[in-house]
Amino acid sequence: MPTPTKGARLGGSPAHERLMLANLATSLFQHGKIQTTETKARRLRPLAEQLITKAKRGDLASRRRVLAVVKDKDVVYTLFDQIAPRYANRNGGYTRIVKTGPRKGDAAPMAIIELVEELADAQPKANKKTAARKAAQQDKVEALAPADEAPAPTGGDQDAEAPVSVSGDTTAARADSDLAIEENNEQNKA
């Protein structure tokens, strides 16, 4: 257990510091990484690592000790069932502090504290976006390829028209407009 700091505490009183660190730990376990001041990140690191070590034990007493600090039961569940098993063969060093630039406004030194191995739910968000782009490009290629390589129709269907939807659009026009809407949405997000 780290020795308590002497002198001024974060937030004024020891009770306020304890509550602030508990809230920071809750946010860290919930989101995988948080941005805060360097001082708060340095003070949070030992607490977060102790809580992960207790969660690795997995027994009821450890769960109750963690619940005494982290009041959100959903976050405790995530800590015990998702975060702790990832660190089963790691002895400490569960967090990383990366210094960022000074904060605009008061020039306080800022840092990002994050769990060393990314959370599983943070990864698919980026993959969905790239997968959507690839799918849109693939659809665009498929839409262009049949028009170039399609053999001329033979037989009595030469006078047949393209299928028309209820709104009066052809399916090709509808596909082009859907692609344009998706591209516009992606540009607005970026």
From Swiss-Prot:
Biased composition (Low complexity): 143-153
Protein species of origin: Salinispora arenicola (strain CNS-205)
Acidic residues bias spans: 179-190
PROSITE patterns according to UniProt: RIBOSOMAL_L17
Database matches in InterPro entries: Ribosomal_bL17, Ribosomal_bL17_CS, Ribosomal_bL17_sf
Any one GO BP annotation for this protein: translation
Entry protein name: Large ribosomal subunit protein bL17
UniProt KW Ribonucleoprotein keyword: yes
Keywords: Ribonucleoprotein, Ribosomal protein
